[in-house]
A protein has these predicted regions:
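Conserved N-terminal entry element of GNAT/NAT acetyltransferase domains
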Residues: 1-12, 142-145
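Conserved GNAT acetyl-CoA-binding A-motif
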Residues: 88, 95-108
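Conserved acetyl-CoA-binding loop-helix of GNAT-fold acetyltransferases
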Residues: 74, 80-93
């Protein structure tokens, strides 16, 4: 693993760096149109930096009393280096420390295996978000030490 810095902040504090990554990955690379939403203002954002440069992001938010992970994105040059796993681990830790017993997420079906390796289990039927097939997944969290 490289010498990365991780920043977690609630609300808009991390949004400018998170937006750079999300625009690059979800809009320019994957072609999504509706990337930003009202959830961003209240979500907890995790951003990973390499030498001060934002390279990956993810968010955690509460919906109907449950913790949801979302918008997990790693710049192409940094994929395959366990950075996505770092983001998820940090957000799961934050969720557990704040009383949540499980995390849920909406995964693009093409990366379902990545989440399964991290302990997530798919449930429900596949559905499309814009043009892309997705599946709901969940994981029971370990209690914080």
């Amino acid at each position: 693993m490289g010498n990365y810095t991780i920043k977690i902040a609630k609300g808009l504090e991390n949004n400018s760096d998170a937006k750079i990554i999300r625009e690059n990955v979800f809009i320019h690379e994957q072609g999504f149109e509706n990337e930003f939403d009202d959830i961003d203002a209240a979500a907890v954002h995790c951003v990973v930096y390499d030498g001060g440069y934002p390279i990956a992001t993810g968010r955690l938010y509460e919906k109907d009393g449950a913790a949801f992970l979302g918008r997990i994105a790693v710049l192409k040059a940094y994929r395959g280096k366990s950075i996505g796993s770092i983001i998820i681990s940090e957000l799961e830790k934050y969720a557990a420390e704040n009383g949540f017993g499980e995390c849920m997420l909406s995964a693009q079906c093409r990366v379902k295996g990545f989440y399964e390796k991290l302990g997530y289990t798919a449930f429900g039927d596949e559905y499309k978000d814009e043009y892309c097939p997705h599946i709901m997944m969940k994981k029971v969290l370990s209690k914080p030490a």
